[in-house]
Regions:
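Residues immediately flanking
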Residues: 37, 79, 102, 163-165
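Residue-level preference for alpha-helix termini and adjacent loops
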Residues: 9, 16-17, 24-26, 30, ...
Length: 174
């Protein structure tokens, strides 16, 4: 029986089985987050099922291009998104530097213009992970107590708004 057809919760029938390499199986929904250099969460997508991260890189990039009207100059992504099949189309869409945390056989020179840029983007991505940790722990992004898929999505978006408002409040005026 395919995972999408399995009922894993009587109370939350929309819950999915989330399997990530070497970790314990989780039940819920996979999220894809996009953040900017300020730390603001710019976009969140609640995925149906458990799609591979690599399959979601280009659709998430396309969402940002559609929203901004232009591609980002640089992007940094988790190792799960790394593949040549993602690198070449991202470059073709106008992204100058694409840094994946895991290289997966891709040369740094193919991803970015220099080793220095790669290190900067890799370190930036580590900061994103810290922001995601704060989002999960301080704003409820790890566990939703609202029932139903639509309520889950509303809960996540309300957590994003709370997270972003706190970042705005912490900004110092010039």
């Amino acid at each position: 029986m395919p995972a999408g057809e399995k009922l894993v919760s009587l109370f939350e029938p929309h819950a999915d089985i989330i399997v990530k390499g070497g970790r314990a199986v989780q039940y819920g929904h996979k999220l894809n987050l996009v953040t900017g250099k300020s730390g603001l969460i710019l976009d969140v997508v609640v995925e149906a099922g458990n799609p591979a991260d690599a399959e979601r890189f280009l659709p998430m990039l396309d969402r940002q291009i559609a929203r901004r009207g232009a591609p980002p100059r640089q992007t940094a992504a988790d190792g799960g998104y790394a593949s040549r099949d993602n690198l070449k189309p991202a470059k073709a869409r106008g992204v100058q530097d694409v840094a994946f945390h895991k290289k997966c056989g891709i040369a740094v020179a193919d991803m970015v213009k220099s080793q220095w840029v790669y290190r900067r983007l890799r370190n930036f991505r580590a900061g994103i992970e810290a922001g995601i940790s704060v989002f999960k722990r301080a704003y409820g992004g790890a566990r939703c107590i609202w029932r139903g898929l639509d309520h889950f999505k509303a809960y996540i978006w309300s957590a994003v708004v709370a997270h972003n408002l706190m970042l705005f409040a912490r900004l110092k005026s010039p």
